[in-house]
Amino acid sequence: MAELLTIDIHTHILPENIPDFGSKYGYRGFIHLDHHRPGCARMMMDDKFFREVQANCWDPEVRIGECDQHRVDVQVLSTVPVMFSYWAKPQDTLDLSMFLNDHIAGIVHRWPKRFIGLGAIPMQDPELAIQELERCKRIGL
């Protein structure tokens, strides 16, 4: 009998470095990371503290080590839900989704036996959502 895989289907990941989307788009409310000490960062919404995260939130190699410790063979990666930004302008959310999806796709391509990726889409605009969903499929999510 074949050995069964242990798959963690509910995990979240962020890019280690998130651009200043507020400056890029011209309005506030977007998350960025404040790396205030090694292996630890504050998720900030503008200047307001949102949540503390550890390196396993952005470092796939740390995740692989933790998965090995817990006998998890594969993780399904998705962005942290606050990053969806459904309140933002649809075109900006598309741009943000593409950034996040490219990040996850890069991890999946580098470690295809360890990670599966789920994409984010701009749900406030069905046509843009379909456009990004189709792109997610093309990039391996």
Q: Residue ranges of each PLM-predicted region?
A:
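Helix-coil boundary/capping segments in enzymes
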Residues: 1-141
